[in-house]
């Protein structure tokens, strides 16, 4: 069996940074699956469509190319909302599922998202669910956006993050939740180095090879 590390969790919990560092430490390719949904949402918005429309989302999936996933404007609040809406569409999730599984199956991988351990790679030998308090996550996302020069109002962002959490947890297909055998890592009071150290210990315990 290849080493597959599934890293799930809500927005701004630190899963992306952690996944990248784990991939580097264990010599594995990394896939931020959230970028796939962000790219689909971005395409819908650019076309003046409705991210909640199955037809608009299906069109965006059909024209998705790798370059779209590399765009620099995928991590802004309006795309956060669009990504959450298209991700609730079963047809979109099904269309992107094979891509994610193929990526993981090649040589092992680190994948981060919201349903890696529960749906995409349910047999992954290492599953992490990274979380943090709502306030900690809000402050991290504010800092991230402002460091990139994105103008954002704190209360509006708070409301949007809360709404996304609720949508992700309540959707019928692949709701956000820890896998039964996932290790929960609360990063509320951890910096990036501390979170990585704890995650690395979990991986080496689960995969002592």
UniProtKB/Swiss-Prot annotation:
Coiled coil: none
Top enzyme category: transferase
Catalytic activity: CMP + ATP = CDP + ADP; dCMP + ATP = dCDP + ADP
CDD domains assigned: CMPK
Keyword field: ATP-binding, Cytoplasm, Kinase, Nucleotide-binding, Transferase
Cross-referenced SUPFAM superfamilies: P-loop containing nucleoside triphosphate hydrolases
Xref: InterPro entries: Cytidylate_kin, Cytidylate_kinase_dom, P-loop_NTPase
Pfam families: Cytidylate_kin
Subcellular location: Cytoplasm
Keyword presence, Transferase: yes
Binding site for ATP: 9-17
GO-annotated biological processes: pyrimidine nucleotide metabolic process
Main location: cytoplasm
GO MF entries: ATP binding; CMP kinase activity; dCMP kinase activity
Any GO CC annotation of this UniProt entry: cytoplasm
Enzyme Commission number(s): 2.7.4.25
Annotated family: Belongs to the cytidylate kinase family. Type 1 subfamily.
HAMAP family named among the record's database cross-references: Cytidyl_kinase_type1
Protein's recorded name: Cytidylate kinase
Species per Swiss-Prot/TrEMBL record: Granulibacter bethesdensis (strain ATCC BAA-1260 / CGDNIH1)
């Amino acid at each position: 069996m290849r080493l597959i590390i599934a890293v799930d969790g809500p927005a701004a919990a630190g899963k992306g940074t952690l996944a990248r560092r784990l991939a580097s430490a264990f010599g594995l390719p990394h896939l931020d699956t959230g970028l796939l949904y962000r790219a689909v949402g971005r395409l819908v918005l650019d076309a003046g469509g409705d991210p909640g429309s199955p037809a608009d989302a299906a069109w965006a999936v059909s024209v998705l190319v790798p370059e779209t996933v590399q765009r620099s404007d995928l991590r802004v609040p309006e795309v956060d909302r669009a990504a959450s809406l298209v991700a609730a569409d079963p047809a979109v999730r099904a269309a992107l599922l094979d891509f994610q599984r193929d990526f993981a199956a090649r040589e092992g991988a680190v994948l981060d998202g919201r349903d890696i351990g529960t749906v995409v790679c349910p047999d992954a030998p290492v599953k992490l669910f990274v979380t943090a308090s709502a306030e900690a996550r809000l402050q991290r996302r504010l800092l991230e956006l402002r460091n990139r020069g994105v103008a954002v109002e704190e209360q509006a962002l708070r409301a949007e993050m809360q709404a996304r959490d609720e949508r992700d947890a309540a959707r019928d297909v692949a709701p956000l939740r820890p896998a039964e055998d996932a290790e929960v890592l609360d990063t509320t009071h951890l910096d990036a180095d501390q979170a990585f150290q704890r995650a690395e210990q979990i991986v080496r315990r689960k995969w002592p090879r």
